[in-house]
Amino acid sequence: MDSFIFALSAVAPIVLAVVVGYFFKKIGMMDEDFAKKANKLVFRAFMPVMLFVKIYDMKLSDVDFGFIGYCLIALFIIFGLSIPACLLIAGKKDRVGVLVQAIFRSGYSLIGIPLAGSLYGDEGMMAATILSAALIPCFNVLAVISLSALGNDSGEKVSPVKIVLDIIKNPLIIGIFAALFCVAVRTLVLEPAGITFKLSNITPLFQVLQYLANLAIPLALLVLGAQFEFSAVAALKKEIIFGTLTRTVIVPALVLGVAFLFFRERFSAAQFATLVAAFATPVAVPSVPMVQEMGGDVTLAGQLVVWSTLVSAITVFLVTFLLRMGGAF
């Protein structure tokens, strides 16, 4: 019973926030135009600031390179295995890259990081934020590769220069690396010189950053709910089922199963919470505009976000319940 309550308490707030966003849309409080503008605010301002604030507080000694290595190896294996599978499943050329992206690219920044906090408090949130410095850039690089190299119906080729520029200009990556730069300066320059300075010393500035950071998660979840569009797309049924089940069932079963069987004593509870956040969450919302920009099947991309989010409400609960029963938390 304790494991059931633990899992429900971790997952329910996130699911309910998304439901509230959908309800606001239905009663006219959040229309499509508002949702688009709010989404831009979240990903261009609030989320980068949140990542900056969380990473800024960490110490270099907090970084577990072994754990990060496991996550990156798992990500690249998933990416590699998904390509031949999607080539077999996808009915059209412009669906292959969309499916591949859906399988490896979880909603880590939007749903995963707050989920890690729900699962294991500030320690879980910190572990997830530290991993984001490595995982989010890799998500973006692999997404661009999958959508360009695996083909699209537009026939356009994306130049390597554009790929690099898009990655560098990504607001989340800017927030992450700005924080890492500050941590490095503080640890390697200021502290050895006997200077103890943090942004919290400048109270007005730090409070403004905290205000913006605190807006990121609740607004992002409300917007996610407001952007839900349910539609039956018979022609995409095979791809939707395959992409949704692979993203929400097969990937977490493999990554978390291996971690539990072979690294249970090695990984902490906060790190298991981070694994759930990184590999059990639904398809990333930003995958849709990226597909649209690069000539993929936008309808499929949108439906994969919707259906994987719905299914993950159940699968994340079950994963959390099983890990709690097994003593990972």
Predicted regions and their residues:
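Alpha-helical transmembrane segments of multi-pass small-molecule/ion transporters
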Residues: 1-329
